[in-house]
Amino acid sequence: MRLEAGQVAVVTGAASGIGLAMARRFAADGLKVVLADVEESALEKAAAGLREDGATVHARVVDVGDRGQVLALADAAYERFGAVHVLCNNAGVGSGAEGRMWEHEPNDWKWAFEVNVWGVFHGIQAFVPRMIEAGAPGHVVNTSSGDGGIAPLPTASVYAVTKAAVVTMTESLYAHLKAEHARVGASVLFPGPHMLRTGLWESHRNRPERYAKERPRRTPYRSLGQWESAMKEAGQEVEFTPVEEVADFVAEGIAAGRFWLLPESEHSDRQIKARSASMLERANPAYLESFILD
C-alpha cells in the first residue's frame, strides 16, 4: 500500500526503540499516529516530542497482554481518527529466564507469551476486522526476531519460542487475508541486520507483579551497555543497526507489499540455509551445537 498524508498508523511498544522510530517515520510521511505502550512516562515523552515536530498524535497506556485494553485502544483510535490504515504489533519483552529450559520459572514463559504472542493476536483481533470492513488499503506489521523467527538462540529460548510463534501467526494472517480478498496486507519484521539499541535488555523494569520471579536470579540483569563492554573486553566488536534504518525499512516494505521484512545479511542467510538443509535432509540440528550454552 502507498503511505499517504492523513492516514492513521497504530504502533504498540511505541515509547522507545523500534516502535518510536516507526512512529516518527510514519509521522514524517504525514500520517497521524496512535502510540501505545505500558510505560507511561516514556510514552508521554515520546508523544510530546512528536507533537513538537508537528505530528498529530494520540497516546494511550496499554498492556497488550490484556485483551480488553487492546480492544479499548482500537475503540479510541477509531473514535479519534475514524480509521486505521497501518497496525504495527511491535511490543515485546525478554523473559529474564536463566539456565536450562527445565529450570525456567513458569512465570518467565507466561509473561513472555502474554506480551510477545497474545499481544500480537490481541492487536490482530481488535483492528483487522475493522480494517477489512473499511475497504481501504491497509497493512499489518508484526515484529519477530532473527532469534526464533529464523533459528533459536538457545541461551534465549523463551524469547525465541515466542518470536517463532509470531512468524507462524503472521503467515497464517497473510493466508486468511488473501482468502478474504482483503485490501489489507501483512508483513513479519526481523529487525536488524545487526544488534539494536532498544529497551529489550531492561524488560524486567515493566514486569507485572502477577508474573513476578519466584526466586532470586543467580546473576544480576545486564544492561545493553554492560553486555557491550563485556564483549569489547573479550575482543569482540559489536555492530549496531540504527532503529531509524529499521523504521525506513518497514515503511519501504509496506509500500512494496513485502511479506518478509528481512534485511540482507550473510549471517541470516547462513542460518536459513542451515536450518532448511537440516529439515530437508532429515538431519539433526547441528547448527545449534555451535552456540555456547553455559
Where are these regions (language model features)?
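Catalytic loop of short-chain dehydrogenase/reductase
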Residues: 141-165, 170-171, 175-179, 192-195, ...
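SDR active-site lid
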Residues: 179-261
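Substrate-binding pocket helix/loop in short-chain dehydrogenase/reductase
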Residues: 98-101, 105-110
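The beta1-alpha1 cofactor-binding region of Rossmann-like NAD(H)/NADP(H)-dependent oxidoreductases
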Residues: 40-41, 61-72, 106, 143
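Conserved amphipathic alpha-helix within the SDR
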Residues: 47, 51, 57-61, 67-82, ...
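Canonical Rossmann dinucleotide-binding motif of NAD(H)/NADP(H)-dependent dehydrogenases/reductases
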Residues: 2-34
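Active-site loop of short-chain dehydrogenase/reductase
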Residues: 6-7, 56, 83-84, 131-145, ...
